[in-house]
């Protein structure tokens, strides 16, 4: 069980950072916040997400924190840690919410002084909306929480990350290496967003909105996207994503070839395979 005498600090009160603050405060933990936007910080204060917070001159909050959760984009997290990482006190264990780990975990762990530990993790619970004002809408229970330890992590830090996930309400918690995580995320998350965005960008289809059915709405739901965040995540994981796009393009081209050749048997075979794999997925899904 997490020690409720420990002080938590959320750096970046966006959608996920705000949700972490909300759930930890509800569970009885002392939570402070740091955020660039005064308006979002005030929202978190007014709604009881955090006990105190600052937009600047926040060094005291960093020094006091026993645990820190970074709700920042990877580039911003690296820059923040280069400037303020020396302020973290001995014994501090901290984590992130980033959807990409390669290029982030190793540099930050290398910058940690003795007695300070970074255990990376990823709550797979993002939404089309952003900002702390929508944090209460996020439901962690059905989502996956992934811990990505390295050889530099202690068993105590890994256990802390798992217990944190439990307090936050996650029901499915797993462990992957950094490389496994980024390969997986390139397929199950980033490729899906790439397909949805490409479908919406293929032509100007706004005139068809009154005719669309559930299939179009379901497939393009995630196309309403945070452009800055997803551009960064795509570029940080571009090797894995390009590989997945190439495989997807190959499968789509097979379907195109079957259509050109009037190959009904090939089409039916593809449909059967997709149905079988989806059924297997449904059985394994938490």
PLM features per residue range, with description:
Residues 58-88, 92-93:
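Rossmann-like NAD(P)-binding element
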Residues 137-222:
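Internal alpha-helical scaffold of NAD(P)-dependent oxidoreductase catalytic cores
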Residues 80-133:
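Rossmann-like NAD(P)(H) cofactor-binding subdomain of soluble oxidoreductases
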Residues 36, 72-73, 97:
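Short beta->alpha hinge that forms the Motif I/post-I loop of the SAM-binding pocket
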Residues 1-63, 67:
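NAD(P)+-binding Rossmann beta1-loop-alpha1 motif at the extreme N-terminus of oxidoreductases
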């Amino acid at each position: 069980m997490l020690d409720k005498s420990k002080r938590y600090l959320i750096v970046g009160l966006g959608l996920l950072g705000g949700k972490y603050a909300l759930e930890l405060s509800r569970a009885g933990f002392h939570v402070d916040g740091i955020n660039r936007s005064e308006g979002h910080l005030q929202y978190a204060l007014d709604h009881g997400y955090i006990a105190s917070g600052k937009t600047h001159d926040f060094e005291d909050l960093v020094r006091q924190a026993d645990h820190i959760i970074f709700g920042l984009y990877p580039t911003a997290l690296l820059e923040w840690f280069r400037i303020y990482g020396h302020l973290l006190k001995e014994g501090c264990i901290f984590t992130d919410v980033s959807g990409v780990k390669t290029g982030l975990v190793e540099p930050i762990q290398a910058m940690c002084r003795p007695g300070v530990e970074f255990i990376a993790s990823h709550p797979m619970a993002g939404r089309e909306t952003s900002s702390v004002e929508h944090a209460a809408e996020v439901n962690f229970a059905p989502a996956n929480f992934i811990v990505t330890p390295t050889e530099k992590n202690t068993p105590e830090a890994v256990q802390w990350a798992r217990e944190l996930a439990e307090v936050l309400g996650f029901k499915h918690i797993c462990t992957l290496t950094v490389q496994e995580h980024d390969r997986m995320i390139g397929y199950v998350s980033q490729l899906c967003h790439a397909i949805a965005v490409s479908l919406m960008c293929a032509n100007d289809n706004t005139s068809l909105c009154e005719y669309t059915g559930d299939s179009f709405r379901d497939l393009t739901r995630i196309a309403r996207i945070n452009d800055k965040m997803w551009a960064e995540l795509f570029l940080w994981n571009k090797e894995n994503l390009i590989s997945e796009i190439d495989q997807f393009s190959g499968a789509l081209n097979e379907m195109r070839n079957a259509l050109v050749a009037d190959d009904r048997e090939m089409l039916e075979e593809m449909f059967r395979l997709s149905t079988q794999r989806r059924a297997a997925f449904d059985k394994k899904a938490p």
